[in-house]
A protein has these predicted regions:
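Conserved P-loop/Walker A NTP-binding site and adjacent catalytic elements of P-loop NTPases
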Residues: 54-186
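Helicase-associated low-complexity/disordered flanking segments
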Residues: 1-58
């Protein structure tokens, strides 16, 4: 069904009449791609190509360049513009350069963390990183698996609550993460 036909259909439904406040048609924009200051690991670039996310958009390349230069970065772009890839690429490159690297990804909800974990596995596993090295740590993580998350996890996806009640009070158990932590990402 065409978009306009779908909108007309929705408007014609009794329960939706007068509920659609605004419709705006945005003209497509031509993609603007950017270059990295330093090349990525060949396997990482191959993974990005295979995942259909190469070449990088200009804002992604700029953010990755800043992150790789050790600068703090805030990425504020529209939805579905590839913000997540900015830190995923930077973290993965760091892991390939130094396998002791750890990253902590904070999400507001368990569902979003699970969704992002699935995307990480699709793009980077098993070719670049074994699946057990990317894990969620939240209230749903079985107690029997928590030690493995601490031991093998290189990218830990969690939420602020678990950071405060599960990780920071038990900092000695999380020494490997905290000692080698090179990246913290907060998505809201």
């Amino acid at each position: 069904m065409e978009i306009q036909a779908f909108l007309n259909h929705i408007r014609s439904l009794r329960g939706y009449q007068d509920q659609i406040a605004h419709i705006e048609h945005l003209a497509p924009r031509r993609a603007v791609y950017g270059d990295l200051d330093a090349p990525l690991n060949d396997r990482l670039e191959d993974s990005l190509r295979a995942g259909g996310v190469w070449p990088l958009y200009a804002h992604q390349a700029e953010a990755i360049n800043h992150i790789r230069a050790g600068r703090n970065v805030i990425i504020a772009t529209s939805s579905a513009s590839g913000k997540t890839l900015c830190y995923n690429v930077s973290v993965m490159q760091s892991l390939l350069d130094d396998p002791s690297t750890r990253a902590l990804y904070l999400f507001p909800t368990k569902a979003l963390a699970q969704d992002q974990l699935r995307k990480l596995h699709e793009l980077f596993s098993p070719g670049l990183l074994p699946p057990q090295m990317m894990a969620t740590f939240d209230g749903d993580t079985p107690r029997s698996e928590r030690a493995d998350v601490r031991r093998y996890g290189r990218i830990i996806l969690t939420n602020p609550d678990m950071l405060h009640i599960g990780i920071l009070p038990n900092y000695q158990s999380w020494a490997g993460l905290l000692r080698h932590l090179k990246s913290v990402s907060y998505t809201h």
